[in-house]
Amino acid sequence: KQPLHALPLLGASLGLAAAGILMSLAASKTRPYSYIPILIGAICAIPSVLSTLMPQQMGHIWILTSAVTALTASALPWMCLSFARISVDSPHSESEIFALPNDIDYQDIKRRYIAGSTMLFIGRICVAALLLIAAPLLNTLDTPLGSALCLAAFLGMLLDSRQIYTFREMCVTVGAAGIGIIVTGSLSVQTHQEFSIPLILLMLACAFATILFTYVLRKHTLFATRVADAAETICIMLILPLAYLAITL
């Protein structure tokens, strides 16, 4: 019997990529969105092939895949902004301040913005899908560090949603993070029953903090912003150490 994250997932990944290619050929007007199944299928095929060839190392392979994916999620806005070539020229001298502005091609800026925004949306969907695919396997490993890695990745994704201002990206990011946290909590409690009480208390504390800063404290204070930034930074910094410990221990 083949594990789900090996040969079966490889077949599903190839089918998803093939469906994306057919979608791009059939619907040229929505061609950028056909890259979503192509990218998800192509990226999932890599750890699936490695897991099929090295089934004993399947857990390690998906731990590395999840860690790289979670770190890539934090760099997506910068990567898409660089790809769209949108920059702001700030004057550095008095002559530049009083100089006549250069002509601005608004249509070109609009096209670049649409391209960058679409790429960012596609990237967020791919990251969310990869983390959700890997979450069941990581939460059923012998070590609870796999669950800790998933929790850090999804919490970082949830905290990163504070910087999102488009409705569709907000739905994808918050929805995937919420589903991932629920899956992590339910599977890790079943697999590692000795950690059920601390995990439940941690999730209750996170829910209380979210409700407090979202609904109770209507005014966004500088303290709350700094606490959220610090929490997001800690989640990102914990990903690589947790992945290393989950592999070596």
PLM region spans:
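Juxtamembrane boundary at the C-terminal end of a transmembrane helix
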Residues: 243-249
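C-terminal hydrophobic structural anchor segments
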Residues: 171, 178-218
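C-terminal ends of transmembrane helices
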Residues: 19-31, 155-166, 211-221
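Interfacial loop-to-transmembrane junctions
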Residues: 218-237
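Cytoplasmic-side transmembrane-helix entry/capping segments in multi-pass membrane proteins
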Residues: 31-42, 169-178, 226-232
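Generic multipass alpha-helical transmembrane bundles of integral membrane proteins
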Residues: 4, 8-19, 36-173, 185-192
